[in-house]
Amino acid sequence: MFLIVGLGNPGKEYEHTRHNVGFDIIDVISEKYNIDLNKKKFKGMYGDGTIANEKVILLKPLTYMNLSGESIKEVTDFYKIPKENVIVIYDDISLEVGRMRIREKGSAGGHNGIKNIIAHFGSDVFPRIKVGVGQPVQRDLVSHVLGKFNKDDREILSKVFEAASDAAENIIEKGTAEAMNKFNGFKA
C-alpha cells in the first residue's frame, strides 16, 4: 500500500497558490485514476483506489502546511504504511517553474512542511516529488509562495502536474530510483 500526499494549505484564499501545488497535483491524480477524496479523517481529506495494481491512498492534510506531519503520521500508523511508501508532493522555490525533481530522502531544505514530516517520522527517508515554483523577485518569501501563478506559468504547470502524476505512478510501479532517472531531467 502507498500513500500519496500533496502538501498545501486549506481554504479558498490558498487555492492555486505556489505553496499549494501539492494539492493541485493530488487533484490531477484523483481525476486521472478516478479516486475521490471524499473522506474526512486523520486531519485531512483522503480517498483510496488503485494505481499500477497497488492500493493507494491520496491525502490532502488540512492541518496547514507546517503541521502536515500530524495528518500523514495518523494515516501511516492506522494503515501500517512504511515511510518508504509515502510519496510527498510539494513546492520548491529552488527549482524554476517547469521543473520537478524526485528524491528518495534528504533534508527539509528550508521547507517547513517537510521539516514537520521528518520530525513525525523520525527519518528523512521517504520519496518526494518537488515541483518548481521559482524564486521570489522583489518580494518576500511568504508573499511569493502564497501568491498565485501568472497565466504563462499556469500553462507550463499543467504539463508539470501531469508529469508529477506520471512520476508518482512510476515510483509505485518501478521504484524511486527508476523514477528519478526518468523524470529528474524533466522541463516543461
Curated annotation (Swiss-Prot):
GO terms for molecular function: peptidyl-tRNA hydrolase activity; tRNA binding. Pfam families: Pept_tRNA_hydro (PF01195). It catalyses: an N-acyl-L-alpha-aminoacyl-tRNA + H2O = an N-acyl-L-amino acid + a tRNA + H(+). GO terms for cellular component: cytoplasm. Keywords: Cytoplasm, Hydrolase, RNA-binding, tRNA-binding. The active site is at 19 (proton acceptor). It is an enzyme of class 3 (hydrolase). The record marks 9 as: Discriminates between blocked and unblocked aminoacyl-tRNA. Its EC number is 3.1.1.29. InterPro entries: Pept_tRNA_hydro, Pept_tRNA_hydro_CS, Pept_tRNA_hydro_sf. The record marks 91 as: Stabilizes the basic form of H active site to accept a proton. One of its GO terms (biological process) is protein quality control for misfolded or incompletely synthesized proteins. TRNA binds at residues 14, 64, 66, 112. It is found in: Cytoplasm. Monomer. Hydrolyzes ribosome-free peptidyl-tRNAs (with 1 or more amino acids incorporated), which drop off the ribosome during protein synthesis, or as a result of ribosome stalling. Catalyzes the release of premature peptidyl moieties from peptidyl-tRNA molecules trapped in stalled 50S ribosomal subunits, and thus maintains levels of free tRNAs and 50S ribosomes. Belongs to the PTH family. This is Peptidyl-tRNA hydrolase. It comes from Clostridium novyi (strain NT).
